[in-house]
Amino acid sequence: MSRFPKLALLASPGEPARKAERQLREIHEFVPIEEADAVIALGGDGFLLQLLHRLLEQRRDLPAYGMNLGTIGFLMNNWNPDDLVNRLERAKSITVMPLMATIEATSGQRFTLPAINEVSLLRETRQAAKLQIDV
């Protein structure tokens, strides 16, 4: 018996991911993510990171298996519709331990958000930015 008897399937909006989603739905039966034991993510790194953030916000400890159908894909497995259940069973599990980033805007408003993979800082002006980073 599989460790993940109930799988959910999510795909990014891009056509390659949507095409792969249709292909997998013809082969396998999937459940809504709320009922799943694991989730298959079709897309790129950004899509997988969005999914991980969503799971963190919902406080769900749900394994995610990503297959690259996006632009980057460093965090993803190669796309292959064959033998999905066995690939999941053989996949090496990695636990993500996100850092919590507390951000204070110039208005004084503070935000605390999980930081997974990377943090990007963008400025709206050409003036020098003053940053304080505490780890």
Spell out what each predicted region is.
Residues M1-E29:
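Short, charged N-terminal beta->alpha structural module
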Residues H28-A38:
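Short acidic low-complexity segments
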Residues G46-L52:
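Short glycine/serine/threonine-rich phosphate/pyrophosphate-binding segments
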Residues L55-Q58:
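Active-site catalytic pocket residues across diverse enzymes, especially alpha/beta-hydrolases
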